[in-house]
């Protein structure tokens, strides 16, 4: 089931560290492409949808479209399966447009529980000491929840989660293993 809701705010826009906006869920940019909100208030609001209840809220993907065209999106995911995908409007061309942001954040992360495949750092994941993204501990935590089936910390063909596709004649000329993912160009395979 898909439901659309348009909660009203006192003001239009998204808060920043320098700007106060009185919006419905206290949606705030946290730097870079980060977004946060009053998550409890968001979940309480979602409980107003006809078939959503406390027993299935953690199986309900919530997509928020903040009233902003500042590019970026993020999907907050909780261990119980709950997810809120923040997908601001975008004026860029596909795949960076609004549709692409929704596909990536809501479809890829919130629904599919897939990990990011792009690269920020020219470093091995287990040697990187940056503070801007997750590393092996966070990666393994997500894997223990059954997430990130598109990523592995091994490049062994028979050990990756998609090995059945690599060795299937219908896909063997398309599916392979590539190094780089989860923001690191080494030590993560997609």
Regions found by a protein language model. Give the residues of each.
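Active-site-proximal segment of zinc-dependent metalloprotease catalytic domains
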Residues: 1-121
